Structure formats: C-alpha cells, structure tokens
C-alpha cells in the first residue's frame, strides 16, 4: 500500500490543479462579466465552495505525501512535493482570508470602483493559486516518476 501513496498524492495534486484551472477558465470570466450588483453575491458563493474544498484536498495531498516519503527511493523528490503542497495550502488559506475580507467590506457598500479592485485582486490571487497548484502537481509527478 505504501507504494501507492506517491501515486495517490499525484492524483490528489492533479485534482487540485485541475479544479483551480477550471475555475480560471470558467469562473474567472463569469466573475469578470458579472454586473456590479450581482458580483459580491456570486463571488461569495464561489469562495465558500472553492475555499472550503481546496484546503481539504491540499491537506489530503500533504498527508499522502508525508506517508509516501519513507516509501520513496528518491526522498528529495517526495520532500520537494510535500513542501510545494504545503506552500500551496498556505497560499490558499491566505488568499481566502484576504478575499473574504475585501468582499465583505465591499458587499456593505459596493461601488463600481471598489468592485473593479475586488475583481482584479481576485484575479491576481487566483492566478497565483493556479500557478502554485500546477507547480505542486509537477513536483508530485516528478516525485512519482523518479521513485
């Protein structure tokens, strides 16, 4: 079973990267095109679901990676992946906190300028999250291929 842990960690990492990439391709254009009065509500709807599921999947990936480290012949590759996924978890958590606070402050009194700022902040954070998830998935794939 321990031989399967690196592969399971790779699958979870790919799922995280895939979900964030889908959000980049589908949700980001939707949020950018929302009318001003609908944006805070839609953004809150998306954030509650994405920012609840993604850290849980990322924690699962960390757990699988940690379990795979003793089993991996190339320990450095597994450690690299575990660190990449841990960094992604921190990034997901920080971005969720920042975006929820900004969204809550704007939802109280939304104006076009504030909503533009929120949209661009969300876009920037999301692009960073997608990049981190893809880097973690690549590191995990390398760990599996090298083991």
Regions found by a protein language model. Give the residues of each.
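A cytosolic-side transmembrane-helix exit/cap motif
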Residues: 98-110
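Membrane-proximal soluble regions of multi-pass membrane proteins
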Residues: 120-124, 129
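Core segments of transmembrane alpha-helices
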Residues: 55-68, 85, 129-138
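Interfacial loop at the N-terminal end of multi-pass membrane proteins
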Residues: 2-7, 12-60, 107-120
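Mid-bilayer segments of alpha-helical transmembrane spans in multi-pass integral membrane proteins
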Residues: 89-100
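Transmembrane helix-loop-helix
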Residues: 66-89
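Hydrophobic/aromatic residues within the transmembrane alpha-helices of Major Facilitator Superfamily
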Residues: 18, 93, 135-138
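Juxtamembrane boundary at the C-terminal end of a transmembrane helix
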Residues: 141-147
């Amino acid at each position: 079973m321990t031989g399967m842990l690196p592969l399971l960690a790779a699958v979870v990492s790919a799922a995280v990267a895939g979900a964030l990439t889908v959000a980049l391709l589908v949700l980001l254009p939707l949020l950018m095109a929302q009318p001003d009065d609908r944006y805070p509500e839609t953004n809150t709807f998306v954030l509650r679901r994405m920012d609840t599921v993604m850290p849980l999947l990322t924690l699962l990936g960390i757990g699988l990676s940690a379990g795979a480290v003793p089993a991996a012949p190339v320990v450095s590759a597994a450690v690299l992946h575990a660190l990449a996924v841990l960094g992604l978890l921190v990034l997901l958590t920080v971005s969720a906190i920042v975006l929820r606070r900004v969204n809550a402050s704007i939802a109280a009194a939304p104006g076009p300028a504030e909503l533009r700022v929120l949209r661009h902040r969300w876009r920037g954070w999301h692009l960073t999250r997608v990049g981190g998830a893809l880097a973690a998935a690549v590191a995990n794939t390398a760990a599996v291929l090298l083991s």
